[in-house]
């Protein structure tokens, strides 16, 4: 099923596999379109188990990765990109070291100086997810600012966000999850020309419902997707379970 909510296009699939493949096919088509117009594109990736399906599908496709600069949207303070619980490590394992990117820019290598890399390389494609609390990157409710003047900032993670990392199997207990992270800001994220948001699993059903039904405010940061003219949301049956069966 496909429908529009404000400017956001929503696709719902029965399975995660179908969802991931469809998102990957759309991302691949977008990459090829952009590379027909210029020599290099800039892509930003999310690091979370919710992205496994789409990344796996992208890896199965013959794409011109050598024309792509890769970025990611957040990183825990105090972790190096080689640390197994870092987002840099996740992305190395799932895409960054699997294909020949032109360049890969890690948040852990720059900290807040990542802003200069972002300024010099405007995003063409943003591949993201939505957190259980409606966050995008680590822009949690209370941290997100739709008018943020910064490109990247230091964020204190809320309890729901930290508990999600346990639910995702990234950390054994709540207390093991770092309290602080670097995150791209909301304006930096929505500056991308195209946004492909992949959100599977029953744990995200409330977040998907809220994204599509609450007012567009920073109390549910993902609602900002509804204001972007080239934003696409991909759900499976579980994450879409609280939506009407017909729209």
Residue ranges and their predicted role:
Residues 1-43:
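N-terminal glycine-/serine-/threonine-rich phosphate-binding loop
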Residues 106, 172-178, 211-213:
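Short, flexible loop segments at the rims of nucleotide/cofactor-binding pockets, characterized by
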Residues 32-61:
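Glycine-rich N-terminal segment of FAD-binding domains in flavoprotein oxidoreductases
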Residues 2-7, 65-127:
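Ligand-binding beta-strand-loop-alpha-helix segment within the catalytic cores
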Residues 184-187, 191-247:
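ATP/nucleoside-binding phosphotransfer catalytic cores, i.e., glycine-rich phosphate-binding loops
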Residues 45-50, 128-132, 200:
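Glycine-rich beta-strand-to-loop/alpha-helix junction loops that act as flexible
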Residues 137-184:
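Class I SAM-dependent methyltransferase SAM-binding "motif I" and its flanking Rossmann-like core
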Residues 121-146:
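Glycine-rich phosphate-binding loop
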